[in-house]
Amino acid sequence: MTELPTVENLINGEWLRSDHERTVHHKFTGAPLATSYDATPAMVTNAVTVARAASRTPLNPLQRYEILRGVADQIAANREELALDVARESGFSIKDCLGDTDRAVQTMLTSAEEAKRIDGEVVPIQAAPGFAHRLAFTIRTPVGVVGAITPFNSPLNTVAHKVGPALAAGNAVIVKPSPFTPIAAAALCRMLLDAGLPPGLIGLVLGPGDPVGQALVDDERVDFITFTGSTAAGKAISARLGMRRATMECGNVSATIVCQDADVLSAAQQCARGAFRKSGQVCTSVQRLYIHADILDEFLDELSAAASKLVLGDPEDPSTDIGPMISEAAAKRAEEWVHAAVDQGARIVTGGDRQGPVMTPTILVDVAPDARLLCEEAFAPVVSVVPFNDLEAVIDKVNDTPYGLQAGIFTRDLDTALTAAKTLRMGGVVINSTSSTRADLMPYGGVKDSGYGTEGPRYAIRDMTEERLILMEPAGGSK
């Protein structure tokens, strides 16, 4: 029997195993991919101790730039191999995984560039009474140790979004990836070491949120937590942090509005992609579609046609558009939500079938307003289509949720677009594209139960640094 590759914890440059091992499976075939080793509480404590010591001597901005640039080059050079690893451990199509790998290159490049641009500002202190001879300015300093907790649905690029800005800001960082998808995270950590990062500045601890993530959060020597995951987990983490700072990128029930004047074909094709890419397992996947009643039938025809063209299957097959969900349990839950909606009066336009962990792209209409598919994050390839007539009323519907990450609107009318931009209570409003649209350098974060803080290297660096005022008086005192 061939021995499986191993995924081990990284502490102070050493790869470490524990007595608690788990198998990482291919999400489509179920075949074992690797053996990973959960970190013990002592390992987490040791990782923080090492990171704390290393953070006291941060790299200078040029060193940070050169290391992060080197990692970007390594990702690009190993693009196909990394994408294949991600496809196997996540179940996402190789098309999507190649795209995510390319995005990780850009995330690291942007982080590298931003490492050279961390600036402060001059404070006009001389305008204050009694301060005419003083000088004041601000600088930004690293927070110290960053704990990065990442989900399964972007195993490489989300880790890059945590690690890149944290290191660019001059911090040490400890990564705790999803136990479903640790392979890409370990590969990125290895690349950082190969690029010359001092070993104490990067750590990797493996295992589930309880107890591994919890141990990382509870250690008060961790100065900052950056988390992507469910709202429930985000709230639990926030409650444990006390006065320590964090970025929380949590759930959403993402909506996109298609107005009467929209390009129906373009909107439908984009919405199909936004709803079903990665089997709908993205925080901004289109889950609620509000379509003007005058174009509803035409839009449904085009959306169904776009969905029918999507190829389901093995994520390693280049022709596959949609692979399995992260687990059969996740697919069963999605199937149950669809059946519950049908029991409440919804009608399935297309899809609704499940085979193991693979859920077919599903479109529903006549969904009850209190159905879970309209009220909670499905995280599945399921979209509910709801007609509307009045813009103000539909904006109220989109806002009538505890969440607020991103929303999209399709319209040719500038006034309509600006009205939506001003009144949709979201972290981002995307005009003439879907809620799932993202560029890695843009600010990305939500409001309400979708979290707080902002991703995107430039913005994450501001969160991961502290502003410090420097106030100077001439050595001889005021003249």
Task: Describe the function of each predicted region.
Residues M1-K27, P32, P124:
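Hydrophobic face of amphipathic alpha-helices that form TPR/SEL1-like repeat modules
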Residues G30, R64, V86, M108, ...:
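Residue-level signal for inorganic ion chemistry
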Residues G30-D119:
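Glycine-rich loop-to-alpha-helix module at the N-terminal edge of alpha/beta enzyme cores
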Residues A31-T35, R221-V222, I257, V311, ...:
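Conserved C-terminal structural/oligomerization subdomain of aldehyde/semialdehyde dehydrogenase
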Residues P32-A39, R52-T57, G147-A148, T256-C259, ...:
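Short, well-ordered beta-strand elements within core beta-sheets of diverse protein domains
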Residues V123-S266, F388:
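Rossmann-like NAD(P) dinucleotide-binding subdomain of oxidoreductase/dehydrogenase enzymes
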Residues A172-I174, I348, G428:
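A short hydrophobic/small-residue beta-strand
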Residues F224, A232-A368, E392, I431, ...:
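ALDH superfamily catalytic-core signature
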